[in-house]
A protein has these predicted regions:
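Cofactor-/ligand-binding subdomain signature composed of acidic, glycine-rich
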Residues: 1-41, 62
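Cofactor-binding active-site loop characterized by glycine-rich and histidine/acidic residues
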Residues: 29-134
Length: 134
């Protein structure tokens, strides 16, 4: 049986963490509906991986750079990126982060200290190593 040790986390902190886990799951579920309806062209679902993205992001300071991958929606929501602009990004709108050039997670945002991802997943590690050493 798995044991949970809350250590020094208050009820409020645990509730906030749960909300941060729930938001990307709700968005993921909606995006899969939109994909099936043909309203978006692609979606790389991260359902079941929310705790990885949210936990890693919450363990970092807001001014530390993070290098997410395409299934790490929780990074973007935990860094409080505006949902309206995220949805414009995924729809390829001019108002999205990449100004309509693509509809995925390949964008970064310096304001939120998020590095844009590379399609080939392995090379992202070298970038993270360089940032950590800088």
């Amino acid at each position: 049986m798995m044991q949970f040790y809350r250590k020094d986390l208050s009820n409020e902190a645990l509730t906030e963490l749960y909300k941060k886990l729930l938001l990307p799951r709700m968005i993921e579920e909606k995006m899969l509906v939109l994909l099936r309806q043909g309203k978006i062209s692609k979606w790389f679902s991260g359902i079941g991986q929310e705790a990885i993205a949210v936990g890693a992001t919450m363990a970092m300071q807001q001014d530390e750079w993070i290098m997410p991958l395409h299934r790490n929606l929780g990074v973007f929501t935990s860094r409080k990126m505006p949902l309206s602009k995220l949805f414009m990004q995924w729809q390829g709108a001019q108002e999205g982060y990449s100004k309509g050039r693509e509809r995925s997670f390949h964008f970064g945002n310096s304001e939120h200290h998020i590095c844009g991802m590379i399609s080939h997943l392995g090379p992202q590690l070298a970038i993270a190593d360089g940032v950590a050493l800088a």
